[in-house]
């Protein structure tokens, strides 16, 4: 089943096949600990690019993971989007980042 959005009385795919492929590749790379993939996912979610909805909590999570691994630009991006987020949203993003790390550690064990 393909998700659709309705615009101007026309149905169109909500996510392009290219966008789905890019996100899937980034998620796979992120699962292998690739810092650039964390950053790319942060960019995608903060801008709503590659067919994903703009989601600042998800973006903060990925920027946080990249920044924690030493990605300087991710740290700047995380700080920038934090200005647009509530304390509750930031706490949620931090919780999600910790959950991601915990899940990755369990997989590695």
Show which residues each predicted segment covers.
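Alpha-helical tetratricopeptide repeat
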Residues: 23, 27, 35, 39-43
